[in-house]
């Protein structure tokens, strides 16, 4: 009744996924929809339910006059990156260290809750391509590597902020790393923060994700909504 969005995915009588969003206003005064929660029960994951939920959210948003949806996600979680950047076509412009403070749940306990803001500009060519099931995976060939994975550990390289693009690789499964080697998980968190936060603060954005698990971080202008 107040411009919010609530949806659920049912299998029989069981709710297996749900999403909730509300109106927001950015610093420039532009109205958007902020997706506060979207989740799929663990046993139903990897069935494209999450992406179907987001596409339903997009259709609802356009019907109600929104052209942008935002939400937070953990940039260290590889499946999050793949869903958001490849399946949905979002862009990322903001990085917030320890966004939620300490969280005691099984996924986050003991790890800083760094988050990025996914910005889903619903009418850009990138999103329209994703909507038509075009493969948005990109090649990192020829791009300098700022953060790589060697024997499961993060290795950073100093690359000038004046460069045009860099790659930042992610661990294969940070959730597993957190449960088995929390010190290594923290090392990954701080390394990715060190590479992403200064660049995004300087006007860069995450423009893509490669097939072998790296963010493409670009120092160029964002695409405008058509």
Features from the language model and the residues they span:
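Conserved catalytic-core motifs of GNAT/GCN5-like acyltransferases
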Residues: 72, 82, 89-108, 208
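A conserved beta-strand-loop-helix scaffold within acyl/acetyltransferase catalytic domains
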Residues: 1-42, 207-210, 220
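Conserved acetyl-CoA binding element of GNAT-fold acetyltransferases
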Residues: 31-42, 164-180
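Short, cationic low-complexity segments
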Residues: 132-166, 190-195
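Conserved acetyl-CoA pyrophosphate-binding loop and the N-cap/start of the following alpha-helix
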Residues: 44, 48-56
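A conserved acidic, glycine/proline-rich C-terminal tail/linker
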Residues: 179-201
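Conserved GNAT acetyl-CoA-binding A-motif
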Residues: 61-74
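C-terminal "cap" of GNAT-fold acetyltransferases
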Residues: 99-131, 218-225
């Amino acid at each position: 009744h107040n411009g919010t969005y609530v949806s659920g995915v049912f299998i029989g009588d069981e709710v297996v996924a749900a999403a909730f969003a509300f109106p927001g206003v950015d610093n420039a005064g532009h109205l958007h929809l902020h997706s506060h929660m979207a989740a799929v029960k663990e046993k139903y994951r990897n069935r494209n339910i999450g992406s179907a939920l987001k596409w339903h959210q997009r259709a609802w948003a356009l019907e109600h006059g929104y052209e942008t949806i935002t939400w937070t996600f953990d940039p260290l979680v590889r499946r999050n990156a793949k869903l958001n950047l490849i399946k949905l076509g979002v862009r990322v412009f903001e990085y917030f260290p320890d966004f939620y403070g300490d969280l005691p749940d099984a996924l986050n306990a003991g790890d800083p809750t760094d988050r990025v803001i996914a910005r889903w500009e619903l009418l850009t060519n990138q999103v329209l391509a994703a909507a038509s099931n075009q493969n948005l995976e990109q090649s990192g060939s020829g791009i300098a590597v700022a953060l790589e994975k060697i024997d499961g550990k993060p290795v950073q390289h100093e690359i000038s902020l004046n460069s045009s693009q860099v790659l930042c690789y992610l661990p294969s499964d940070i959730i597993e790393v957190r449960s088995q080697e929390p010190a290594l998980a923290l090392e990954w968190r701080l390394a990715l923060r060190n590479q992403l936060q200064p660049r995004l603060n300087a006007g860069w954005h995450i423009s893509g994700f490669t097939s072998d698990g790296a963010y493409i971080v670009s120092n160029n202008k964002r695409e405008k909504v058509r």
